């Protein structure tokens, strides 16, 4: 029997419902329970796949090829369960499915309404996503009081009635602000947020109160009194330097035990030793390395959320504090590569569109010519191919057909056909819809013997997640290989280039897939760990060069 924990948010958005849900999931998993997490998004887009990163942040790709909310990335980084397309759905998807059923005649001519048809569909999707787990944590996007969230809140209210309080539990995440002018912590916003939630029929069982500092006992007692929540169930969650401390903080306040008690679950004590090691390693680095992330969405760091976390994970596993310098590729176009002079390694992430492309190409050229470790992900690999073709293979004006359809050397072109992981041939053509038509999800990759990629992974075949519409043009690969480009990874059917590297460079790697989606704080990822180690080596080599003249004078 699956138990359901519904997590809502109040007062303001961006309080950290996703991190809190994932942290509670980690605690319950450490107590011996099988856990899954769902995210219900109230926007009308079918999925975030075609949304601007500036509006939505990163699109997280699941193993089965769904384009989902970035919170699913948090879920996978905190728990061992793998998310699927069933773990995230939107208002748009719910309405699309209901309308499809109506057109098919499933409702036998009835009038389709929010209640019961939309709410029934929401409940069915929640049950489907939770199937097989001991506990399903269901995060409701948005803020209580938003009109968009009402169908989701109504659906979970109905689930409490249908399943009872031994199988459902409500957690409300709320803000308790500190007003500096008055010198006081204010509980009134939380009181009103709970009042709003109760007005639609939901009484929270547990409150998680976000604040700058830990809540004093007096304020916790006051919140408990005015919200009808027992004082032990008012949890204080103050700001922390690392999100990986949160499972420990919530465990120490007894949240996991409180949940198990309310849901009548017999569970063991939570063993969070792995999380203690992660936090200790992050707090006590022995080295520092500076990485330039050259992109065009750098004004919103959530656009590269999994990427920044993967670099942090690599730092944890190399005892290194990773300083990330986000550099706008258009700034490099304007001011040149001076912006890259002080970094130890360069990373060009994925992206779409022609804006800022030449700046990324300059960054790849700078890394190649100066022996600086380079990691190109998705578009970043394609950028490296374009740069190499132009400046090493004498292919003047080489480009991707995404940016220049009339380029004389289309070294990167539209992927028209590929073999999916299941052995099915997928096909795409110009003019297809943008949404859901890319090469998506986990795809197998075969690594070349004696390549850097093979050494980093320690195996000859890996599965990594993809999200792209363009690929390296096989017709021009031979010319590039003659000039020193190494194709170190290919798709299983040999049709697509998955990884490249340079034989005459200390560490220059490009991958068509997104390794950041499978990095976790407890395991890291071999590509990022190798990249950070290379950055440290480059930093030490630079120090040695700078020290050499003074050494000669001493001699």
From Swiss-Prot:
HAMAP family: PyrG. InterPro entries: Class_I_gatase-like, CTP_synthase, CTP_synthase_N, GATASE, GATase1_CTP_Synthase, P-loop_NTPase. CDD domains: CTPS_N (cd03113), GATase1_CTP_Synthase (cd01746). The keyword Ligase applies. The gene is pyrG. The active site is at residues 378, 514, 516. Pfam families: CTP_synth_N, GATase. Catalyzes the ATP-dependent amination of UTP to CTP with either L-glutamine or ammonia as the source of nitrogen. Regulates intracellular CTP levels through interactions with the four ribonucleotide triphosphates. Mg(2+) binds at residues 71, 139. Residues 290-541 form the Glutamine amidotransferase type-1 domain. SUPFAM superfamilies: Class I glutamine amidotransferase-like (SSF52317), P-loop containing nucleoside triphosphate hydrolases (SSF52540). Pathway: Pyrimidine metabolism; CTP biosynthesis via de novo pathway; CTP from UDP: step 2/2. CTP binds at residues 13, 146-148, 186-191, 222. L-glutamine binds at residues 351, 379-382, 402, 469. GO terms for molecular function: ATP binding; CTP synthase activity; glutaminase activity; identical protein binding; metal ion binding. Its EC number is 6.3.4.2. CTPSs have evolved a hybrid strategy for distinguishing between UTP and CTP. The overlapping regions of the product feedback inhibitory and substrate sites recognize a common feature in both compounds, the triphosphate moiety. To differentiate isosteric substrate and product pyrimidine rings, an additional pocket far from the expected kinase/ligase catalytic site, specifically recognizes the cytosine and ribose portions of the product inhibitor. This is CTP synthase. ATP binds at residues 14-19, 71. Residues 1-265 are annotated as: Amidoligase domain. UTP binds at residues 13, 186-191, 222. It catalyses: UTP + L-glutamine + ATP + H2O = CTP + L-glutamate + ADP + phosphate + 2 H(+); L-glutamine + H2O = L-glutamate + NH4(+); UTP + NH4(+) + ATP = CTP + ADP + phosphate + 2 H(+). Allosterically activated by GTP, when glutamine is the substrate; GTP has no effect on the reaction when ammonia is the substrate. The allosteric effector GTP functions by stabilizing the protein conformation that binds the tetrahedral intermediate(s) formed during glutamine hydrolysis. Inhibited by the product CTP, via allosteric rather than competitive inhibition. GO terms for biological process: 'de novo' CTP biosynthetic process; pyrimidine nucleobase biosynthetic process. It comes from Coxiella burnetii (strain CbuK_Q154).
């Amino acid at each position: 029997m699956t138990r359901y924990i519904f997590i809502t948010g109040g007062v303001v958005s961006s309080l950290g419902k996703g991190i809190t849900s994932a942290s509670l999931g980690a605690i319950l998993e450490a107590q011996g329970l099988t856990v899954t997490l769902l995210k219900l998004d109230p926007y009308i887009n079918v999925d975030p796949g075609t949304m601007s990163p500036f509006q939505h942040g990163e699109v997280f790709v699941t193993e089965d090829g769904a384009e989902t909310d970035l919170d699913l990335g948090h879920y996978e980084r905190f728990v061992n369960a793998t998310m699927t397309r069933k773990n995230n759905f939107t208002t748009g998807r719910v309405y699309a499915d209901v309308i499809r059923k109506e057109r098919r005649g499933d409702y036998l001519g009835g009038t389709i309404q929010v209640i019961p048809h939309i709410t029934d569909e929401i409940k069915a999707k929640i049950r489907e996503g939770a199937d097989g787990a001991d506990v399903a944590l269901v995060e409701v996007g948005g803020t209580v009081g938003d009109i968009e969230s009402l169908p989701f809140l109504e659906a979970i209210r109905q689930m409490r009635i249908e399943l009872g309080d031994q199988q459902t539990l409500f957690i409300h995440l709320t803000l308790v602000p500190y007003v500096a002018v008055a010198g006081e912590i204010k509980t009134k916003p939380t009181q009103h947020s709970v009042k709003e939630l109760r007005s639609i029929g939901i009484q929270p069982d547990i409150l998680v109160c976000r604040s700058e500092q830990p809540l004093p006992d007096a304020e916790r007692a006051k919140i408990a009194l005015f919200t009808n929540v027992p004082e032990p169930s008012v949890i204080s969650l103050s700001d922390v330097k690392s999100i990986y401390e949160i499972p420990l903080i919530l465990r120490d306040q007894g949240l996991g035990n409180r949940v198990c008690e309310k849901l009548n679950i017999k569970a063991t004590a939570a063993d969070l030793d792995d999380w203690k090691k992660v936090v200790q390693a992050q707090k006590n680095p022995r080295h520092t390395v500076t990485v330039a992330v050259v992109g065009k969405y750098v004004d919103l760091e959530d656009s590269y959320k999994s990427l920044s976390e993967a670099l942090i994970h690599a730092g944890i596993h190399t005892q290194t504090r990773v300083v990330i310098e986000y550099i706008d590729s258009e700034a490099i176009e304007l001011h040149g590569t001076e912006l890259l002079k002080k970094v130890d390694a360069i990373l060009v992430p994925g992206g779409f569109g022609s804006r800022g492309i030449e700046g990324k190409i300059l960054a790849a050229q700078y890394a190649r010519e100066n022996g600086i470790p380079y990691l190109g992900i998705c578009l970043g690999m394609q950028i490296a191919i374009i740069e190499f073709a132009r400046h090493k293979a004498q292919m003047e004006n080489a480009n991707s057909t995404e940016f220049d359809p009339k380029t004389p050397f289309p070294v990167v072109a539209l992927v028209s056909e590929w073999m999916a992981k299941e052995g099915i041939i997928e096909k795409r053509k110009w003019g297809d819809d943008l949404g859901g038509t890319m090469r998506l999800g986990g795809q197998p990759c075969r690594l070349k013997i004696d390549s850097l990629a093979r050494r980093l992974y320690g195996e000859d075949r890996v599965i990594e997640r993809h999200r792209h519409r363009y690929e390296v043009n096989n017709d021009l690969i031979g010319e590039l290989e003659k000039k020193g480009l190494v194709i170190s990874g290919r798709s299983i059917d040999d049709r697509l280039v998955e990884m490249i590297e340079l034989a005459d460079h200390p560490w220059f790697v490009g991958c068509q897939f997104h390794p950041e989606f499978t990095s976790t704080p407890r395991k890291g990822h071999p590509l990022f760990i190798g990249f950070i180690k290379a950055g440290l080596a480059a930093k030490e080599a630079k120090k040695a060069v700078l020290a050499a003249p003074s050494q000669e004078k001493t001699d």
